[in-house]
Amino acid sequence: MALRFPRFSQGLAQDPTTRRIWFGIATAHDFESHDDITEERLYQNIFASHFGQLAIIFLWTSGNLFHVAWQGNFEAWVQDPLHVRPIAHAIWDPHFGQPAVEAFTRGGALGPVNIAYSGVYQWWYTIGLRTNGDLYTGALFLLFLSAISLIAGWLHLQPKWKPSVSWFKNAESRLNHHLSGLFGVSSLAWTGHLVHVAIPASRGESVRWNNFLDVLPHPQGLGPLFTGQWNLYAQNPDSNNHLFGTSEGAGTAILTLLGGFHPQTQSLWLTDMAHHHLAIAFIFLVAGHMYRTNFGIGHSIKDLLEAHIPPGGRLGRGHKGLYDTINNSLHFQLGLALASLGVITSLVAQHMYALPAYAFIAQDFTTQAALYTHHQYIAGFIMTGAFAHGAIFFIRDYNPEQNEDNVLARMLDHKEAIISHLSWASLFLGFHTLGLYVHNDVMLAFGTPEKQILIEPIFAQWIQSAHGKTSYGFDVLLSSTSGPAFNAGRSIWLPGWLNAVNENSNSLFLTIGPGDFLVHHAIALGLHTTTLILVKGALDARGSKLMPDKKDFGYSFPCDGPGRGGTCDISAWDAFYLAVFWMLNTIGWVTFYWHWKHITLWQGNVSQFNESSTYLMGWLRDYLWLNSSQLINGYNPFGMNSLSVWAWMFLFGHLVWATGFMFLISWRGYWQELIETLAWAHERTPLANLIRWRDKPVALSIVQARLVGLAHFSVGYIFTYAAFLIASTSGKFG
């Protein structure tokens, strides 16, 4: 018999139903469950696949550069970044009639094009790229890296070049390599690029390979470095009337601590960013020499963890046993990595708008909105994934004997306390926040808006004041004009910071009031509830009061029959599934809040947000309904316009989202009956019954149907909001 899909599971390959296909796809990446897998092959397969992942990333970024160089308007945009719309790529569509061709021909292009809302133009401009030739060079280089990655992946699957398990489990060497070799060296290299190429470009000087060795990045060269007069590198920074990309108002400093923003570009000073990357490089280069490898000096991570025993013995055996538990569990390591990456991605979303690093990106409002929303959604998916793999760790890898009475075991021992506290916090936040919103709704409905309960966020305002925001009238720390911190800030460090915090032309420490207080607590409710579901799913993954032996059922069992009071919806997978809905819900509130507050700021009618955000009807009417009018206007009696594609995507997104419920709200038996009826009709229809199938069609399993429903719900939800966000922002601000 010919080998059927999936080759990695003989049991599945012999399944006579369509379950073979779906389960095959579902377990294709679960290498641990494949036939004939060994620990060594598991590690080697994952290692090799990382190179494939890198190859795809390099190919994708190369494609971005290539298409902008080929079909974009980068050189025209460089001449006037604030008024030329950046083109991502051309649109070739044989269905376009004349109205469509006219609607999408913009940005100085000859035919229909897509506008770039990704910020790549601003990024490339900031780092010193100026011509299409530069972009082509970058595209070719990344293509080369992509090829190298593919070759490396193939190479590490050859018997001679396959690393051993001991190599993968050498935590100290890996840490040293990643800290020094990857973070440290790459940060140092980036500092070098900023100092040698980007900063000269911002001052109107082109540095390329042909003159790279002739142009001094600083008039005094390396002299100050070797004589210890490092402060010379900070002297004579760019002036406040510096025109970015020209020598007008330019200085000679390369490493500064100015603080605040470049007045023209509204982005962080390049010389501050070079300084930042140099400091990061230094820290990581040091950190990467801390762990003991072949030379017998430095820390052993196992020794560090074993030494972590809390005083007095009241917290058990501390971190004993953790080293082997983590080092032998890929799921634990992946969980830690995803948790860190998720937090970092969310921080990127926050910092990209509050402290914009790229020239002129702060004035490109649609790009700002798109980047914030994009990074928050990505963060949500990554963070939920962290808990999914945490749960799989407890089911597949956790050994109670190895972890007796250490922090991990003690966390499991008092999981009821953890879960009930989270539950209490979620209930408190939910009822109080909804209570305030609904009370305010009723007051507005009965025409007595003055009876709303409006709470000033005084603690948050105090924190903003401590960082230098003066408008609230708190006389504290950096907002206290007589204090030593304030005086030092004027001269020694970050003199531009206080101006930036108190200017209203950026997003640093936005003024907050009762509407912000309420939505902050709505978001806190979402975060705590999502966390509650995820934490409960992971801590109960091996067993709970109702079902003590979950471990034997695995990660994604649907139910254990009607016994024990009915055990549906209690697998670790079910917790993850439910949590993703809450995650999407929460990020909805986060992005609604960010977008509405910023739209009113950019339009100069901030009172609309302040007055309408204190009750639910305000959100529905003055944010969602009012801003979706552009979408519904993509086609009108006068023909179509450039928003029509978003109007279509808005409708299509709703369709995909609604389709999700077909899978989420139905019983498996209904589908099986439907399939049997369709198969019966097929077999009795002339001509059609000439086509047969090998696999008996069966309905999706409960877990699979939920996954398909969740996928449609998520994709449709994000498509719908993306169309709304981009159309409503670009429709207002161009």
Swiss-Prot record:
EC number: 1.97.1.12
InterPro entries linked to this entry: PSI_PsaA/B, PSI_PsaA/B_CS, PSI_PsaA/B_sf, PSI_PsaB
GO CC terms: chloroplast thylakoid membrane; photosystem I
Keyword DNA-binding set for record: no
Catalysed reactions listed for this entry: reduced [plastocyanin] + hnu + oxidized [2Fe-2S]-[ferredoxin] = oxidized [plastocyanin] + reduced [2Fe-2S]-[ferredoxin]
Ligand binding (phylloquinone): 671
Cofactor note: P700 is a chlorophyll a/chlorophyll a' dimer, A0 is one or more chlorophyll a, A1 is one or both phylloquinones and FX is a shared 4Fe-4S iron-sulfur center.
Residues noted as binding chlorophyll a B3 in the record, renumbered to the chain: 662, 670
Keywords (A to Z) from UniProt: 4Fe-4S, Chlorophyll, Chloroplast, Chromophore, Electron transport, Iron, Iron-sulfur, Magnesium, Membrane, Metal-binding, Oxidoreductase, Photosynthesis, Photosystem I, Plastid, Thylakoid, Transmembrane, Transmembrane helix, Transport
Membrane topology: Multi-pass membrane protein
Annotated positions binding chlorophyll a B1: 654
GO MF annotation terms: 4 iron, 4 sulfur cluster binding; chlorophyll binding; electron transfer activity; magnesium ion binding; oxidoreductase activity
GO annotation terms (biological process): photosynthesis
NCBIfam families given in the database record: psaB
Family: Belongs to the PsaA/PsaB family.
Annotated protein name in UniProt: Photosystem I P700 chlorophyll a apoprotein A2
Lineage: Eukaryota, Viridiplantae, Streptophyta, Embryophyta, Tracheophyta
Gene: psaB
